[in-house]
């Protein structure tokens, strides 16, 4: 297996002007993608569109960012898996809490679910990172790859759970 030769973003640790510019570009790319995802989610809710499929599709935006920056998806695998497991499982108690106890239940379900799923997903993230390293694949820990990898995983995991919930008849309609 060839080592990953994708660009690295070491942030400001090297102190060089080149690293600072590269880090600024990565930060701007992340910010643009994050704002686009947030605006698309708001747009979806305003129009009462099915949330699950839209969130699932929004997972493509951060993947696009990784590809534009020539980041290896294999290097982002631990973050993708972490995000998918973490937020995919988190949606379950948040959804249940919201349907059962309203907004407060959704918040409590989300907070408790997040605490539990961070630990569960962390086991998988660490195991996958170790597996990749043993095979000579650099599972990059630069800020852009990690942030966009986790964002992708979170959107795909949550979107998939919401789509499955809707197939079981769970409706996610606003009651304003």
Regions found by a protein language model. Give the residues of each.
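Multi-pass alpha-helical transmembrane bundle typical of ion/small-solute transporters
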Residues: 2-176
């Amino acid at each position: 297996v060839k080592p990953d030769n994708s660009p690295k973003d070491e942030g400001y640790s090297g102190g060089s002007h080149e690293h600072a510019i590269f880090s600024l570009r990565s930060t701007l790319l992340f910010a643009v993608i994050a704002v686009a995802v947030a605006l698309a989610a708001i747009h979806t809710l305003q129009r009462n569109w099915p949330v699950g499929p839209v969130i699932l599709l929004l997972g493509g935006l951060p993947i696009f960012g990784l590809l534009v920056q020539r980041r290896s998806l294999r290097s982002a695998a631990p973050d993708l898996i972490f995000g998918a497991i973490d937020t995919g499982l988190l949606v379950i108690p948040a959804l249940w809490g919201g349907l059962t106890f309203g907004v407060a239940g959704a918040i409590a379900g989300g907070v408790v679910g997040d605490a539990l799923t961070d630990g569960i997903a962390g086991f998988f993230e660490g195991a996958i990172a170790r597996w990749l390293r043993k095979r000579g694949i650099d599972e990059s820990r630069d800020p852009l790859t990690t942030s966009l990898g986790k964002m992708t995983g979170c959107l795909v995991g949550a979107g998939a759970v919401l789509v499955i919930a809707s197939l079981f008849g769970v409706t996610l309609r606003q009651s304003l």
